């Protein structure tokens, strides 16, 4: 689960964790262990070549990110689905268990032991995370993947101006241009969605129901934008005081949300036998459970692939890949979920794609201008890789 992130959001679950921390994915060998020859086995050279391949890392990152959104959409798309809190609780349980197993295997060596004092200070941030991920799944339940992806860009605007208000700074003209394109793409996407709903069933009661469903999706999406911004900005304010290291944020977020999500599920969701049968029909029950488990593991996969991408390319390349990944992510919704392909929807996807490129370019130029006068400390790979806060 972690922080479904969207790649363009500058703040993320690990941002602000101590920039000098070594990412566990970037250095697996212990100093006490002898270096093994690269050709130790028949496939040693082949795997070593893949491990240092920029193309392989980029493809792995894109596939892990796309699969996360597609699986989330699949799970919540059932016509009778109404157990979102339960789904998110399973995600958190799986992700927490995976983190602890990775720690035991030595993959997350710098994951600190649980600290109740830190947990109390971090708990309000975890509550904001619950709001973010719940509204995210509700929006994804009512909206198509392309529209969800396009509207998710609006979070960037709210976060940017929230940073200006809370932490100072400014918004560059190029960033303003990207914001305008993001708003334009969202308007086009909404218009295309409504047009497709009306033309598909005509001006009937069915059309009214379809538009009502879309309106519910837009309402949840609007709440998700502000919940995501509140979580990211609040986390940035608190995380500097916590001295969290790599993956501590992911661990605390998932662990602390488990009891909240379970209680909310028991209080607000229908656990009757009839409702469970509706949510988990026999013909899709196994695939739903597999999807729920995978979605919890996907947070680990995304973090690994992100750190891998940064290690063999650069943080700038990683940011650009995140922007470019919006296009295949939106297209995946057209392929897997039969979202309507219209001139308006294609135009919205293209404009949203361009807005992501413009925004990434503006942030790259801004960082270069900040680095030129002085030397800035390098951000850790996992701090950069976990900027996926939000989807999904």
UniProtKB/Swiss-Prot annotation:
It is a multi-pass membrane protein. GO terms for cellular component: cytoplasmic vesicle membrane; endoplasmic reticulum membrane; Golgi apparatus; Golgi membrane. It comes from the Eukaryota. Residues 29-38 have a biased composition (Polar residues). Keywords: Cytoplasmic vesicle, Endoplasmic reticulum, Golgi apparatus, Membrane, Sugar transport, Transmembrane, Transmembrane helix, Transport. InterPro entries: TPT_transporter. It is found in: Golgi apparatus membrane; Cytoplasmic vesicle membrane; Endoplasmic reticulum membrane. Residues 77-80, 145-149, 199-213, 270-287, 338-342 are lumenal. One of its GO terms (molecular function) is GDP-mannose transmembrane transporter activity. Residues 1-40 are annotated as: Disordered. Residues 1-55, 102-121, 169-174, 235-248, 309-316, 362-392 are cytoplasmic. The chain crosses the membrane at residues 56-76, 81-101, 122-144, 150-168, 175-198, 214-234, 249-269, 288-308, 317-337, 343-361. One of its GO terms (biological process) is GDP-mannose transmembrane transport. Homooligomer. Belongs to the TPT transporter family. SLC35D subfamily. Involved in the import of GDP-mannose from the cytoplasm into the Golgi lumen. This is GDP-mannose transporter. The gene is vrg-4.
């Amino acid at each position: 689960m972690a922080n479904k992130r969207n790649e363009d959001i500058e703040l993320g679950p690990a941002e602000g964790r101590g920039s000098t921390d070594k990412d566990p994915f970037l250095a697996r060998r212990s100093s006490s262990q002898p270096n093994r020859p690269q050709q130790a086995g028949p496939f040693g050279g082949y795997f070593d070549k893949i491990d240092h391949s920029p193309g392989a890392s980029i493809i792995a990152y894109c596939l892990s990110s796309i699969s996360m959104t597609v699986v989330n959409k699949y799970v919540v798309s059932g016509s009778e689905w109404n157990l979102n809190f339960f789904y998110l609780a399973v995600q958190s349980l799986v992700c927490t268990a995976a983190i602890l197993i990775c720690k035991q295997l030595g993959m997350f060596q710098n994951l600190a032991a649980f600290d109740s004092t830190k947990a109390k200070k971090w708990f309000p941030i975890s509550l904001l995370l619950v709001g973010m991920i719940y509204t995210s799944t509700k929006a994804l339940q009512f909206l198509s993947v392309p529209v969800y992806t396009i509207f998710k860009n609006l979070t960037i605007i709210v976060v940017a101006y929230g940073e200006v208000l809370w932490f100072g700074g400014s918004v560059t003209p190029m960033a303003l241009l990207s914001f305008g394109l993001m708003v334009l793409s969202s308007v086009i996407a909404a218009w295309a969605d409504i047009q497709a709903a009306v033309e598909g069933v005509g001006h009937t009661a069915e059309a009214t129901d379809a538009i009502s469903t879309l309106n519910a999706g837009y309402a949840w999406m609007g709440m998700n934008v502000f919940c995501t911004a509140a979580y990211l900005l609040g986390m940035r304010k608190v995380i500097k005081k916590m001295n969290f290291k790599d993956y501590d944020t992911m661990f605390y977020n998932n662990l602390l949300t488990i009891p909240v999500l379970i209680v909310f599920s028991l209080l607000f969701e229908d656990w009757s036998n009839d409702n469970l049968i509706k949510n988990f029909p026999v013909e899709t029950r196994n695939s739903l459970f597999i999807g729920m488990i995978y979605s919890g593991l996907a947070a680990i996969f995304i973090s690994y692939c992100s750190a891998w991408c940064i290690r063999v390319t650069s943080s700038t390349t990683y940011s650009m890949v995140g922007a470019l990944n919006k296009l295949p992510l939106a297209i995946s919704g057209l392929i897997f979920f039969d979202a309507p392909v219209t001139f308006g929807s294609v135009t919205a996807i293209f404009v949203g794609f361009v807005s992501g490129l413009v925004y990434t370019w503006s942030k790259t130029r801004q960082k270069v201008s900040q680095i030129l006068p002085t030397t800035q400390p390098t951000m850790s790979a996992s701090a950069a890789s976990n900027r996926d806060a939000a989807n999904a």
